[in-house]
């Protein structure tokens, strides 16, 4: 049904950027591409109602948003098949990041139950700019100015150090990890979980309960996978100023790191990496 799956053609799934590429001790400015990350709000029109009810906000890469909405509604048990949907269209929102799904008259939905079940984070607006501003308002930690630099050889040592701490990953190959290091690359603590966001929450929670220094402004956070907006958000709340990861960051993760004064390093493998924001904290 073309009415149901009309493409959102003005959205792009990748975005051009420039990175400082560090190979060995050589630093160069290179063009690159990153995956776009933006919020998508899913709204429902049920029965005779003329007011759409927001039920979920999810961070996603634009593209096939209508399919994402249908899949979400089906896997959450809100619809049983495609025929339950009358239409899907882009909501009247200037960001273009909201979809309204109109259900057919025979479909009954307990909207009050949905509101309780789906937690929509207050820091997640329906445009990237709103999300960034919300995090800036939440992060009221006073951060000291940093004078330090991380030597490239310290940076290159971090992936192996993290891997050595991941006992569960070594056995299963299916778990995310993160670790905190001091500026000399000495291991402090790590956490693991099947969810990368949970792993970081565990690590920060341990710091809150056992370490005297929050914010963690003089530490390095090392991640085992990709860097999403939410991971940078959590790190920013803890005052972390340096994030390194084996994987790539999303576009919104880069934007947030830039705004919050966080050095963001991705594709850290062997003796090479990409520095996406605030490269002054890396000493080649």
Show which residues each predicted segment covers:
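Short, Lys/Arg-enriched N-terminal segments with co-localized hydrophobic residues
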Residues: 1-7
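Intrinsically disordered, low-complexity regions enriched in acidic/Ser/Thr/Pro/Gln residues
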Residues: 8-178, 182-183, 187-190
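Feature captures the catalytic cores and cofactor-binding loops of soluble hydro-lyases/lyases
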Residues: 115, 196-284
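Short beta->alpha transition motifs characteristic of CBS
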Residues: 192-194
């Amino acid at each position: 049904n073309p009415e149901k799956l009309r493409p959102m053609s003005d959205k792009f799934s990748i975005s051009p950027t420039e990175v400082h590429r560090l190979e060995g001790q050589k630093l160069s400015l290179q063009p690159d591409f990153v995956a776009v990350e933006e919020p998508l709000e899913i709204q429902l029109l049920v029965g005779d109602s003329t007011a759409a009810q927001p039920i979920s906000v999810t961070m996603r890469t634009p593209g096939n948003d209508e399919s994402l909405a249908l899949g979400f509604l089906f896997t959450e048990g809100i619809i049983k098949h495609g025929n339950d949907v009358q239409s899907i269209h882009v909501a009247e929102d200037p960001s273009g990041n909201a979809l309204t799904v109109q259900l057919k008259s025979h479909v009954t939905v307990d909207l009050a139950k949905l509101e309780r079940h789906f937690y929509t984070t207050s820091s997640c607006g329906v445009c990237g700019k709103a999300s960034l501003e919300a995090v800036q308002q939440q992060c009221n930690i006073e951060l000291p100015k940093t004078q330090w630099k991380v030597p490239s050889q310290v940076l290159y040592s971090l992936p192996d150090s993290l891997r050595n701490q991941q006992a569960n990953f070594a056995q299963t190959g299916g778990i995310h990890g993160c670790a905190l290091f001091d500026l000399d690359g000495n291991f402090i603590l790590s956490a693991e979980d099947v969810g990368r966001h949970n792993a970081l929450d565990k690590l920060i929670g341990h710091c809150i309960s056992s370490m005297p220094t929050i914010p963690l402004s003089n530490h390095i956070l090392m991640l085992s996978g990709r860097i999403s907006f939410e991971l940078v958000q959590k790190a920013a709340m803890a005052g972390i100023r340096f994030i390194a990861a084996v994987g790539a960051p999303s576009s919104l993760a880069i934007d947030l790191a830039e705004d919050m004064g966080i050095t963001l390093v991705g594709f850290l493998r062997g003796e090479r990496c990409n520095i996406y924001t605030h490269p002054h904290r890396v000493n080649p």
